[in-house]
Regions:
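Short alpha-helix within the catalytic core of nucleotide-sugar-dependent glycosyltransferases
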Residues: 1-6
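Generic N-terminal initiation segments characterized by hydrophobic and/or small/turn-forming residues
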Residues: 7-9, 25, 183
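A short, conserved acidic/glycine-rich loop-to-beta-strand motif
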Residues: 7-17
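Acidic/proline-rich low-complexity IDRs
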Residues: 9-11, 64, 185
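Conserved nucleotide-sugar donor-binding catalytic segment
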Residues: 15, 21-23, 27-113
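C-terminal subregions of glycosyltransferases and related glycan-biosynthesis enzymes
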Residues: 72-73, 78, 85-186
Length: 186
């Protein structure tokens, strides 16, 4: 929240994340996103430039844009696109702000027909914001439709390789919380 006080024009701020198995014993990887606004705008042409669980935004400014769009999937990405296309300043912190549980079931959820339809709605919304050209939209649509139809094992491989592999190092805050919880349960 210090960033919003120090930079009043900042509307959206996020950071890096690490994804872990449910027991926090195996790290799936780190999703790294760009930190500066120009880098974020460039990255947004190919991938989501924010890690949703790490994001904070100025509510009043987001509501002035209409709030979260009513799309069937990727609502966060559609909102970020609306913010960026409106010319608002965005940034990401270079450090890991979230250590989250992830899992292989994410791939299966993203392979459903319902998810594909929702994702298509989100892609159309992002195109309508003006963030993407039609050719960029078409490339995203085609790529995502093809990937979502691949076998889950192929999608898991693709998903894993989009994450930066890092050594498994349980976050200190988790160790403290886990220790406190075990003490409480006794």
């Amino acid at each position: 929240l210090e960033m919003f006080s120090a930079t009043p024009e900042l509307v959206l701020f996020g950071g890096q994340i690490q994804e872990w198995d449910p027991s926090f014993t195996r790290c799936f990887g780190r999703r790294t996103v760009p930190t500066s606004h120009p880098q974020i705008l460039e990255f947004a042409q190919s991938r989501n430039p924010f890690n949703g669980p790490s994001v904070a935004f100025q509510r009043v400014r987001v509501l002035s844009l209409g709030g979260y769009p009513l799309v069937g999937a990727n609502e966060d990405y559609a909102l970020w696109a609306s913010i960026m296309a409106s010319g608002h300043v965005t940034a990401n912190h270079a450090e890991d702000l979230v250590f989250m549980r992830g899992g292989e079931d994410l791939v299966a959820r993203r392979s459903t027909q319902r998810y594909r339809r929702g994702e298509e709605e989100a892609l159309k919304f992002i195109y309508r914001t003006g963030l993407w050209s039609f050719s960029r939209f078409a490339l995203h649509w085609l790529t995502k439709q093809l990937i979502r139809r691949l076998p889950d094992s192929w999608n898991r491989y693709i998903y894993r390789n989009l994450r930066q592999t890092i050594p498994a190092q349980v976050p200190l805050i988790y160790e403290k919380a886990h220790s406190a919880w075990n003490t409480f349960q006794l």
